[in-house]
Amino acid sequence: MTVTLAGNPIEVGGHFPQVGEIVENFILVGNDLADVALNDFASKRKVLNIFPSIDTGVCATSVRKFNQQAAKLSNTIVLCISADLPFAQARFCGAEGIENAKTVSTFRNHALHSQLGVDIQTGPLAGLTSRAVIVLDEQNNVLHSQLVEEIKEEPNYEAALAVLA
């Protein structure tokens, strides 16, 4: 697939999950460096907020906005996923008062980038994840998925959250 970064084409590899598909279990790294598996949240609905780096304005904004919304969602976990080191994620969450969303890192599992179809393969952000939102039910069935066409733009929060209403 192709998305853009400041209007320039960027190739994104892997299969991006579509509504009705099932996302297989994966393992990420929490802020305490412990493994965090998707299946750890088997009894909950999940919002996967995927982005290149928490140290960019748009990515930070998405974490803040989903954190605000997470407090209003019942039986739902918001996972904010990037390749940032857990130390950077923890620093950001502490400074910003992020308590309702959980930041997790792909730094020990780059295969996840392809598994979720967000592997940036070309351009200056190659090796990071493209911006996307995937909403899953308790059995990891995809309820909503958006691969954001322009990496510098925010996802459609309303569409993602509407499937959880």
From Swiss-Prot:
Protein name: Thiol peroxidase
Pfam short name (any one): Redoxin
Assigned EC number: 1.11.1.24
Keyword ATP-binding: no
Function field: Thiol-specific peroxidase that catalyzes the reduction of hydrogen peroxide and organic hydroperoxides to water and alcohols, respectively. Plays a role in cell protection against oxidative stress by detoxifying peroxides.
Stated family: Belongs to the peroxiredoxin family. Tpx subfamily.
Annotated disulfide bonds: 59-93, 59-93
Molecular function as annotated in GO: thioredoxin peroxidase activity
Assembly and interaction partners: Homodimer.
InterPro entries: Redoxin (IPR013740), Thioredoxin-like_sf (IPR036249), Thioredoxin_domain (IPR013766), TPX (IPR002065), Tpx_CS (IPR018219), Tpx_Peroxidase_subfamily (IPR050455)
Domain of life: Bacteria
